[in-house]
């Protein structure tokens, strides 16, 4: 029986690390993709030692076309699971942001998701089985603060929903998870001040991963972890977009996301 393989982008911290640890615990071999080669190797060594599984490291900056091509080539060889987790936000206002940084954000958040999914699907379809989990954000479902980041995540949601319809009957599952605020390094790295966010709005990585995999197993396409975020997104769909934007400006207390 072939070994099950999961390829995960951005696995060295936060949600990506949570997925890596969970799939390792479930007996999968791993392909870990990150631009942080040192942390990547340390995580791979730890997970290999724990279960004797094969953990392949693939250092890559998904903002660079050549590195995306390298990861795509690995995917054409076949994996059972692809988790497109890598992504980032930037701080400051859109009109003062470095255009190159904004383009890099789209390269990682959008282009890599498209390219890696395209590379992975043919082998999954041929096998009649496979799972793609795209990590978006609740920001992709809400009108309001945030421009490039929120738009990139809205693209991921729409992309996943469209493919989920097209892949019906193939045995391949397409899923997108839209977390809210999660205790990770994400906001610190982006320079976003989160000190005023109420404690009840925070989610834990393990809970996000657990809910995602449970909902994916049940066939759900758009996965929103946490009852608070289910309530917020449901309410947002029921009111005019102008009111939704106003509510989001209050809810989105983290300032400075572009």
Predicted regions and their residues:
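Active-site helix of classical SDR
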Residues: 117, 152
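Conserved NAD(P)H cofactor-binding loop of Rossmann-fold oxidoreductase domains
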Residues: 85-90
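Conserved glycine-rich Rossmann-like NAD(P)H-binding loop of the short-chain dehydrogenase/reductase
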Residues: 28-43
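Residue(s) in the substrate-gating loop at a strand-loop-helix junction
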Residues: 137
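Conserved glycine-rich cofactor-binding loop
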Residues: 12-13
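C-terminal helical subdomain
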Residues: 176, 196-233
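Substrate-binding pocket helix/loop in short-chain dehydrogenase/reductase
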Residues: 93-104
């Amino acid at each position: 029986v072939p070994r099950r393989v999961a390829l995960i982008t951005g696995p060295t911290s936060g949600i990506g690390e949570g997925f890596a640890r969970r799939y390792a615990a479930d007996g999968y071999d791993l392909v870990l993709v990150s631009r942080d080669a040192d942390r990547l190797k340390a995580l791979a060594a730890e997970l290999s030692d724990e279960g004797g599984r094969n953990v392949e490291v693939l250092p890559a900056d998904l903002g660079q076309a050549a590195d995306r091509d390298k990861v795509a080539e690995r995917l054409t060889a076949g994996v059972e699971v692809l988790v497109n987790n890598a992504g980032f936000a930037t701080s400051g206002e859109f009109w003062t942001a470095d255009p190159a940084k904004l383009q890099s954000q789209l390269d990682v958040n959008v282009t890599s998701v498209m390219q890696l999914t395209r590379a992975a699907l043919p082998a999954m379809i041929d096998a009649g089985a496979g799972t793609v989990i795209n990590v978006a954000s609740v920001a992709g479902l809400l009108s309001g603060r945030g421009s490039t980041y929120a738009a990139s995540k809205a693209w991921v949601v729409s992309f996943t929903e469209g493919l989920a319809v097209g892949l019906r009957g193939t045995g391949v599952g397409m899923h997108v998870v839209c977390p809210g605020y999660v205790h990770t390094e994400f906001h610190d790295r982006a320079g976003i001040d989160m000190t005023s966010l109420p404690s009840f709005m925070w989610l834990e990585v393990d809970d996000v991963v657990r809910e995602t995999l449970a909902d994916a197993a049940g066939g759900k396409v758009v996965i929103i972890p946490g009852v608070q975020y289910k309530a917020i997104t449901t309410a947002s769909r029921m009111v005019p977009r102008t009111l939704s934007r106003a509510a989001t400006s209050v809810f989105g207390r983290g300032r400075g996301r572009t």
